[in-house]
Amino acid sequence: MADTATGSPTSHGHVSPFVEIARADWAALAPATHLPLRETELVQLRGIGDRLDMREVEDVYLPLSRLLNLYVTGTKKLHRDTSAFLGERAKSTPFIIGVAGSVAVGKSTVARLLREMLARWDDTPRVELVTTDGFLHPNAELERRGLMERKGFPESYDRRALLRFVTQVKSGVPEVRAPFYSHLAYDIVPGAEVVVRQPDVLIIEGLNVLQPAASGAKLAVSDLFDFSIYVDARTHDIAQWYEERFLSLQRGAFSNPRSYFHRYAELSPAEAVARARGIWSAINEPNLEQNIRPTRSRATLVLRKDADHSVANVLLRKL
């Protein structure tokens, strides 16, 4: 018996806000015209450990990009009609997509791929991607608050700054700036910024983008999304992917003397596995279970992955 994104059964008379679509049925929804995407581009978009291939793109992400294109077109028309009804001049505002999910689940790859595919549709040539990493408090501030071991948890972010950024973009501000985060330094880079200039589509990717409003706040970042995606998988599969990614980084990026995690570069294979599992158990799994997965039911669409990273089925919120 299949489960919905809320964890409730989809059969035996139970009501769900989602319709569950098997991969084969979803793939059949792909438009006849293929969007141009070369294998060399796919290699650049693929995350560490992700097994994304052209078959996956055609079966899963081509139909998704078409669905998003329909949502963009429909939202623009509704905006124009509403402006006409109010007797106002229609002002174009970006269509905002949120992409959420656990560490190592592949949400960054999904976000990058959608950025490239949506930019190939005629009516959305300007697509920007911003990750919420830039809205983490700097390490010095996290240390001051005793939150370094909870980096990635909701309280480690400057949620007001993120909300202000998305509000300004959605309001049509010509140029909006966000802090820049370095994964090498594992910190915000002072003076460096990401600049967003009125895109057709803005993708916001991060662990907690579907979180409800913070205590005392009237608005959540997700309230400003036109569409949201949750990348889902079984916990034990994500844990395995995280371990594989950690080992890959240990052999690669961690060997850079400037890497924040350079101290892990000389670990033995057994020590590296133990360290990866320790980080997962102490930080990433609790964050997934306490904060990230509970937001799954807030998404417009859920991509549910199997152990090999391929999407097995899609859950789409009923209109």
Curated annotation (Swiss-Prot):
Q: Provide the species name.
A: Clavibacter sepedonicus
Tell me one Pfam family matched here.
PRK
Its protein name is Pantothenate kinase
Top-rank lineage group of the source organism? Bacteria
List the EC numbers from the record. Answer: 2.7.1.33
Transferase listed as a keyword: yes
- The principal localisation class reads cytoplasm
Entry's Gene Ontology cellular component terms: cytoplasm
Q: Which family does it belong to?
A: Belongs to the prokaryotic pantothenate kinase family.
Q: Which reaction does it catalyse?
A: (R)-pantothenate + ATP = (R)-4'-phosphopantothenate + ADP + H(+)
List the subcellular locations.
Cytoplasm
Gene name, Swiss-Prot/TrEMBL: coaA
Cite the entry's keywords alphabetically.
Answer: ATP-binding, Coenzyme A biosynthesis, Cytoplasm, Kinase, Nucleotide-binding, Transferase
Residues the record lists as binding ATP? G101, S102, V103, A104, V105, G106, K107, S108
Q: In which pathway does it act?
A: Cofactor biosynthesis; coenzyme A biosynthesis; CoA from (R)-pantothenate: step 1/5
Q: One MF term from GO for this chain?
A: ATP binding
Q: Name one GO biological process term.
A: coenzyme A biosynthetic process
